């Protein structure tokens, strides 16, 4: 900290916040030095100083000092002054700054930082996120590439925002990022690579780089580890299940253990078997996002276990016994969703979704449909078609599919142009 961060303290107020002081449109996947302004050697990864800021905040957690605290707060104030869209900040750097602010809020109790992160998160969703919930590498540079480092950041920020606000919208954001963005960028060898971003410029998902071994594969590993960590949250006597995964949970200090069985986002059931239960009443809170249709709930036969919906969760409460089963049977509806980036002026562009999953299709050019209503029909758990056409839809989600590679010339069309009068949104 003394040699890396302390020397920059006197330069923070000189940090160039104007896009006119930058060389526009430069940078490759690993970044490059642009020019020097006010003592700062500027990177094409605009705002990358905030990646360092998050590391400084992490170190402050273990080695606190007044010097570190003062510098952290100067850097946070600098980030708050930066016009992310105007300066075309790197989205990875911006999201890492948000993670740092959330960590600092937890360390210091300064909850005023949380709504500031929420504002920046909204900006990212509007101008920095692709139509399959990856990222544009920079705000406003829509013809570049995506970066799993930032996609992982976005998953962490969304989940952490839910943890501190309990706003269920953030869980929906995280679910879609994990199943579409993170899953789409993991390659057959387990590494992570960059894609061509779907949305403002490109109508299709394609490979930009098979693997970014120098950064994204490492961050991808962290993302998968965090997905396991985020499978369950515990607060007092409530076990939250914000995301569904085949998994087990053991809390020896609370005398709680259970196993979870599901094919989510495929299939139609998530089941929990209690293998150890305390003598006190506890609550199992199961996520019910807005795109999930809760068809039925299976509860233990004894009468003191009840279920009710609260703030995006099905809360199952009562005294459980070892061997009890709780299950949620669910369904999804295929639907057309308007493209979400605010810089997309054409309001006749849509994407197909099934629950949290973005669907794509094989074609050389984006579809243009007009003249009648075009519904999406499910032919199976991962097979769909646009009624009245020959076009088949499949999820962009995949699990280590070797076909997702530049060598296989992988690409999937996502956007569809339709007369709004012919769109069946549900």
Label for each model-derived stretch:
Residues 278, 321-322:
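Surface-exposed loops/turns
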Residues 1-20, 66-87, 112-133, 175-188:
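Long, well-ordered core segments of solenoidal/helical folds
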Residues 117, 171-273, 309, 318, ...:
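C-terminal beta-rich recognition modules with glycine/proline-rich loops and embedded aromatic residues
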Residues 304-310:
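Short beta-strand segments within Ig-like beta-sandwich modules, predominantly Fibronectin type-III
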Residues 32-64, 91-123, 138-288, 296:
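Aromatic (Trp/Tyr) and acidic
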Residues 1-77:
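Extended ligand-binding groove/face enriched in aromatic
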Residues 313-315:
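Short, surface-exposed beta-strand/beta-hairpin micro-motifs centered on an aromatic residue
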């Amino acid at each position: 900290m003394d040699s890396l961060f302390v020397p920059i303290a006197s330069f923070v107020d000189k940090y160039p916040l104007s896009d006119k002081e930058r060389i526009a449109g430069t940078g490759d996947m690993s970044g490059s030095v642009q020019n020097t302004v006010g003592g700062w050697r500027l990177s094409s990864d605009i705002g990358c100083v905030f990646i360092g800021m998050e590391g400084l905040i992490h170190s402050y957690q273990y080695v606190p000092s007044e010097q570190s605290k003062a510098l952290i707060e100067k850097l946070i104030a600098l980030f708050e002054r930066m016009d992310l869209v105007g300066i075309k900040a790197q989205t990875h750097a911006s999201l890492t700054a948000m993670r740092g602010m959330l960590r600092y809020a937890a360390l210091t109790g300064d909850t005023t930082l949380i709504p500031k992160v929420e504002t920046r998160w909204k900006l990212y969703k509007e101008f920095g996120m692709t139509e399959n919930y990856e990222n544009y590498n920079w705000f406003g540079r829509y013809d570049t590439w995506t970066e799993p480092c930032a996609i992982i950041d976005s998953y962490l920020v969304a989940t952490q925002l839910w943890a501190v606000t309990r706003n269920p919208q953030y869980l929906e954001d995280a679910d879609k990022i994990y199943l579409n963005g993170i899953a789409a960028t993991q390659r057959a060898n387990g590494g992570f690579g960059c894609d061509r971003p779907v949305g403002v410029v490109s109508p299709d998902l394609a490979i930009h780089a098979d693997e970014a071994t120098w950064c994204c594969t490492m961050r991808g590993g962290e993302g998968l580890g965090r997905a396991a960590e985020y499978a369950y949250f515990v607060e007092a006597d409530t076990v939250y299940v914000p995301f569904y995964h085949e998994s087990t949970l053991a809390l020896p200090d609370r005398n709680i253990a259970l196993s979870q069985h599901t094919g989510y986002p495929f299939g139609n059931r998530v089941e929990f078997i209690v293998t150890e239960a305390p003598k006190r009443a506890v609550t199992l809170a199961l996520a019910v996002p807005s795109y999930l249709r809760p068809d039925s709930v299976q509860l233990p036969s004894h009468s003191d276990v009840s279920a009710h919906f609260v703030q995006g969760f099905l809360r199952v409460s009562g005294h459980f016994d070892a061997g009890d089963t709780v299950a949620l049977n669910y369904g999804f509806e295929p639907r057309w969703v308007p493209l979400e980036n605010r810089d997309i002026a054409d309001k006749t562009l849509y994407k197909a979704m099934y629950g949290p999953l973005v669907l794509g299709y094989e074609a050389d050019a984006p579809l243009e449909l007009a003249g009648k209503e075009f519904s999406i029909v499910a032919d199976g758990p991962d097979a769909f078609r646009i009624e009245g056409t020959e076009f088949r839809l499949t999820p962009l989600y995949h699990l280590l599919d070797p076909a997702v590679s530049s060598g296989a010339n992988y690409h999937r069309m996502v956007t569809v142009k339709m007369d709004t009068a012919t769109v069946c949104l549900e």
